[in-house]
Design a protein with these regions (language model features):
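Residues that define the transmembrane beta-barrel architecture of outer-membrane proteins
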Residues: 42-44, 95-99, 165-171, 189, ...
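Predominantly the C-terminal beta-signal and adjacent terminal strand-loop region
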Residues: 59-61, 67-68, 229, 233-294
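Short glycine/proline- and aromatic-enriched beta-strand/turn motifs that initiate or cap beta-hairpins
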Residues: 25-105, 271-287, 294
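Flexible, solvent-exposed coil segments and beta strand-coil junctions
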Residues: 76-84, 148-157, 204-210, 252-257
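Outer-membrane beta-barrel translocator domains and adjoining extracellular loop/strand segments
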Residues: 58-64, 126-132, 203-212, 253-259, ...
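Extracellular loop and loop/strand-boundary signature of outer-membrane beta-barrel proteins
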Residues: 33-34, 86-89, 157-163, 209-217, ...
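Gram-negative (and chloroplast) outer-membrane scaffold detector with strong preference
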Residues: 40-42, 102-207, 275-280
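Bacterial Sec-dependent N-terminal signal peptides
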Residues: 1-33, 294
């Protein structure tokens, strides 16, 4: 599995930044300890946003009753929905693009635990040249029947169509740390970094030998990730996030034609996200109210 220079560089940045960020939060390196910490302990927050994604090349293994073969160094891309206010801002269509949502809780003023979904879309590029190893029996395909060993072959739609377009669903929990960069009146700019671990529940759209696949949701594997970004509080309660996430996905149980026919792959990913969120000091207000009314 080859990893592009772009993905290698950004993953290295996220890895280093994530280790340094807790130190930044205390102000040791950026000397921001003189700034008063925002009272975020017990604060609840939620956000919704959209993403673009890039993927490393991957080897994809297909197994079934009459075939067992691997395609090597498959290139893939995301499938971004062209911007339209009607699609991106209408409640019944906001689920069509590549989206993200998370809900979190501040354990203290600088540490947040959250859970959420990254809905990416993964499309193996058609008509690319690849290599194949393994076997395909004539019961599966007369056209492609044979034994292969690193044999060049074209990745055409009548051979294999391989997509996670509804989608590449990464459900994860993340632990993030925050550090102050700037504050004026009610506005504030923070940076954050974190670690995530979760599972993949794709709805894979796969056709083999010109036969339509099952196209069902299925728990296919696991993933892990690092995230870093900026949070800008515009007014109390309302904020925007800009962030980059990089990670590794391993799916060893992808349903293709039916639950007896499977695929497996592993790859690195990068994701750029923009989101709008709302935070609520519900527990703090409740605690203060109980103190004022003993």
């Amino acid at each position: 599995m080859r990893v592009s220079f772009k993905i290698q560089s950004l993953l290295l940045f996220l890895f280093v930044f994530s280790f340094l960020q807790p130190l930044y939060s205390e102000g040791d390196l950026l000397k921001i300890s003189c700034l008063k910490s925002t009272e975020r302990k017990k604060q609840i927050w939620i956000y919704w946003g959209y993403n673009r994604a890039q993927y490393s090349k991957s080897n994809i293994n297909f197994t079934g009753p009459n075939y067992d073969f691997t395609l090597f160094d498959i290139c893939a891309k995301d499938r971004a929905t062209p911007f339209s206010a009607r699609v991106y801002f209408t409640p019944n269509t906001i689920w069509i693009p590549q989206y993200n949502y998370r809900i979190g809780y501040f354990l203290n003023d600088w540490l947040s635990l959250n859970i959420g979904l990254d809905h990416m879309k993964y499309v193996a590029v058609t008509d690319q040249m690849t290599k194949i190893s393994g076997r395909i029996d004539s019961l599966s395909s007369l056209q492609y029947a044979g034994n292969y060993e690193q044999t060049p072959i074209e990745f055409t739609s009548d051979f294999v169509r391989f997509e996670h377009t509804d989608g590449l669903n990464y459900v994860s929990a993340e632990l993030e740390t925050y550090g102050r960069l700037w504050k004026k009146n009610k506005q504030e700019l923070d940076f954050f970094a974190g670690y995530g671990l979760g599972v993949l529940i794709p709805r894979s759209d796969v056709d083999l030998f010109d036969h339509e696949g099952a196209n069902i949701f299925h728990l296919a594997g696991w993933g892990t990730s690092l995230v870093a970004g900026l949070r800008f509080d515009i007014i109390p309660g309302l904020f925007v996030n800009m962030s980059v996430k990089g990670g590794f996905i391993h799916m060893a149980d992808i349903v293709t034609m039916n639950k007896q026919e499977k695929a497996k792959q592993k790859f690195f990913f990068l994701q750029e996200m923009a989101s709008v969120g709302y935070s609520l000091n519900y527990f703090n207000k409740k605690e203060k109210a109980s103190q004022n009314n003993p």
